Amino acid sequence: MPLSFLPKIIAKSLTDLTPELLRSRKIRLLMLDFDNTIVPYTTDVPTPEMAAWLEKMNKLEDIRLCIVSNSHKDRVPTFCRERGLDCITYARKPSGKGIRECLSRYGVPASEAALVGDQIYTDTLGANCAGVTSILVDAISNHNFWLKARHVLELPFILIARNRRMKQ
């Protein structure tokens, strides 16, 4: 797959993604980054809006959810167990290891899957290299210097992707 830092879809938040949008793109498997996409790095408690979105989406029969995280801590599996969600940790994004494992687990081709995350250099690049639809969302929190710096470095790719989308 091509090496691309440009997301296919940009959304403000994970909660902005609707079943209708995903169905229109023929997405049957939605892989979700965890940190700063579902919850901030500093807590494992989602906002009420995020909790409601996860619950609603997890009840859908035609779109499956799986958290695909680079985290190697117990917080992701614990979060998922409490909410009836599946997860893959140690995903090693941007390598396709965790993404391919998820596709195989669900028996879904890459063309019918998407990965949502807040980072271009891990989530978007990993999704694009694996051939799944990349969806970039705003980070929930830029609580330290390195997160702010990373987002500044990602800004040119975001602007190019937005400009490309406006021309379509």
Labelled PLM ranges:
Residues 2-32, 39, 43-44, 48-115, ...:
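Asp-based, Mg2+/Mn2+-dependent phosphohydrolase catalytic module
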